[in-house]
Amino acid sequence: MQPGGQPNMQQIMEQAQKMQQQLMTAQQELAEAEVSGSAGGGLVTAVVSGSGELKSVAIDPKAVDPDDTDTLSDLVVAAVRDANRAAQELQQEKMGPVTGALGGGQGLGGLGLPGL
């Protein structure tokens, strides 16, 4: 802080650069991570990246009933949703510390600027 309670611009820039690097690292970790979700007691499993991109769907042959494709469709949707929920939790885990430093994701309050 400079006299008068104003933050030092150099400190603000250093903190912003550090947070940017943390954000980039977290985004890279999310892109490389994979999480899975399942439905029907594991009959259908979906794998998504940490950023939510669908990677694969595995269907146990026991789940395939040619006379009841609606149930299989429901299981696939449920498995993908479960995997996406897991990806969102991972995103919160990885990005939470970074967005928390930004004032809980509400602007630039974490930079120490008055009034923010």
Swiss-Prot record:
Gly residues composition-biased segments? 101-116
Keyword Cell membrane applies: no
Task: Alphabetically list the UniProt keywords.
Answer: Cytoplasm, DNA-binding
Q: Which Gene3D superfamilies match?
A: Nucleoid-associated protein YbaB-like domain
The record's section on SUPFAM superfamilies has: YbaB-like
The molecular function terms in GO held by this entry are:
DNA binding
Q: Which GO terms describe its cellular component?
A: bacterial nucleoid; cytosol
The record, for HAMAP family, names: DNA_YbaB_EbfC (MF_00274)
Q: What is this protein called?
A: Nucleoid-associated protein SACE_0254
